[in-house]
């Protein structure tokens, strides 16, 4: 290894071969930023494809109870039923003028939805039937029923 003697050997290249201190500061700042992004940053690839729509559920899940009152809850057949997409959940209210309200909750297919939100008289004298449909999972269960009441 040879050493240079004379004026060329004593001449310093300066801090990292920079000719001015602002250039050195910018370079140090750039190095710090790159190091911080490598240490703390995460590489997230860019997806240029349009987002795919969420898959439509195959079945609607509904609450099923064959005999229910507000005071006592479900008395007969508490269960879950599945119905194809496009169908609905239903709650039938059988009421009379004294305030009695007996309910039946179930699934209803598209073909059976002709009486949607319909009030009609019952075969039992003094009672009428009100049907209430909804189209979200478990929208007819007792906790959610009030949220979907028109």
UniProtKB/Swiss-Prot annotation:
- Per the UniProt entry, the signal peptide is 1-41
What taxonomic classification does the UniProt entry list for its organism? Eukaryota, Metazoa, Chordata, Craniata, Vertebrata
User: What is the official name of this protein in its record?
Assistant: Lymphocyte antigen 6 complex locus protein G5c
Tissues of expression: Detected in T-cell lines and fetal and adult lung.
Q: How is it modified after translation?
A: N-glycosylated.
Q: Which InterPro entries match?
A: LY6_UPA_recep-like (IPR016054), LY6G5C (IPR026110)
- Using the UniProt annotation, give the residues that carry a glycan (glycosylation sites): 96
Q: Any idea where this protein resides?
A: Secreted
Q: What would be one Gene Ontology cellular-component term for the protein?
A: external side of plasma membrane
Could you list this entry's UniProt keywords, alphabetically sorted: Disulfide bond, Glycoprotein, Secreted, Signal
Taxonomic source organism: Homo sapiens
Q: Any idea what job this protein has?
A: May have a role in hematopoietic cell differentiation.
Q: Which residues form the UPAR/Ly6 domain?
A: 60-150
Q: Please give the subunit comment from the record.
A: Forms oligomers.
Concerning Pfam families, the annotation shows:
UPAR_LY6 (PF00021)
Molecular function GO terms recorded:
identical protein binding
User: Which cystines does this chain contain?
Assistant: 62-89, 65-74, 81-107, 134-139
């Amino acid at each position: 290894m040879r050493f240079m003697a004379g004026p060329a050997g004593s001449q310093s290249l300066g801090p990292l071969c920079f000719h001015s201190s602002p250039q050195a500061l910018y370079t140090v700042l750039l190095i710090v930023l790159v190091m911080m992004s490598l240490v703390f940053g995460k590489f997230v690839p860019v997806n240029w494809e349009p987002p795919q729509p969420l898959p439509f559920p195959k079945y609607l899940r509904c609450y099923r109870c064959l005999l229910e009152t507000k005071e006592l809850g479900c008395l007969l057949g508490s269960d879950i039923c599945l119905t194809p997409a496009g169908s609905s959940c239903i709650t039938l209210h059988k009421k009379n003028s004294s305030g009695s309200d007996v309910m039946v909750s179930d699934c209803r297919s598209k073909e059976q939805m002709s009486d949607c939100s319909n009030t009609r008289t019952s075969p039992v004298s003094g009672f009428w039937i009100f049907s209430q449909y909804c189209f979200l999972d478990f929208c007819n269960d007792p906790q959610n029923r009030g949220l979907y009441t028109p």
